[in-house]
Amino acid sequence: MSSTRLETLALCLQNVLADKLANVDQQLDQLIITVSPVNLLPVMSVLRDHPELGFEMLIDLCGVDYSIYGVEPTSEQGREGKRFAVVYHLLSIRHNRRVRVKAFPEDDEFPVVVSVIDIWPSANWFEREAFDLYGIVFTGHPDLRRILTDYGFIGNPFRKDFPLSGNVEMRYDPDQQRVVYQPVTIEPRQITPRVIREEHYGDSE
């Protein structure tokens, strides 16, 4: 969206949602609003139902693990040191615009947010995926179980503290004539330190 349209949408959101917004930001031609988990459900309902907003479609939902992210959190980002986020991408077909919504669960050890499945049924499998990969619990979800990993899988593979080699590996056992699980035999690998460059690195070259 153009900067003018983004500013118009930002002003509309601030007028309609007022103190329910923790933060409003623009990044890469995208409007991002941060919402407290306590206000998530009422905010999402307004985003869908208000005639000036009309975000009738949830096109994506994902989890984020910000631990060892490499960038210090600031109050302006609305994160303030919290580890996990749930990110929602909404589309208004009527007004031809998008908005990104972030909610940061309060408890890093047991991240919980309310399910938005009653507002957008498409959230069903999205929330199951975030639960499976990040361990984020969505209260009110009618069938919150793993969707990508095995039923007996241990841990959440998209968390930053999950080992790259996993916890177990599979092999065929000729004596038992079946596939069996065993502890991983891969040796730890040397990981190259992450390099975070400045935002406009290389622009002058």
UniProtKB/Swiss-Prot annotation:
The keyword Cell inner membrane applies. It is a peripheral membrane protein. It comes from the Bacteria. Its EC number is 7.1.1.-. Pfam families: Complex1_30kDa (PF00329). The keyword Cell membrane applies. It is found in: Cell inner membrane. InterPro entries: NADH_DH_suC, NADH_quin_OxRdtase_su_C/D-like, NADH_UbQ_OxRdtase_30kDa_su, NADH_UbQ_OxRdtase_CS. GO terms for cellular component: plasma membrane. NDH-1 is composed of 14 different subunits. Subunits NuoB, C, D, E, F, and G constitute the peripheral sector of the complex. NDH-1 shuttles electrons from NADH, via FMN and iron-sulfur (Fe-S) centers, to quinones in the respiratory chain. The immediate electron acceptor for the enzyme in this species is believed to be ubiquinone. Couples the redox reaction to proton translocation (for every two electrons transferred, four hydrogen ions are translocated across the cytoplasmic membrane), and thus conserves the redox energy in a proton gradient. Belongs to the complex I 30 kDa subunit family. This is NADH-quinone oxidoreductase subunit C. The lineage of its organism: Bacteria, Pseudomonadati, Pseudomonadota, Betaproteobacteria, Nitrosomonadales. The gene is nuoC.
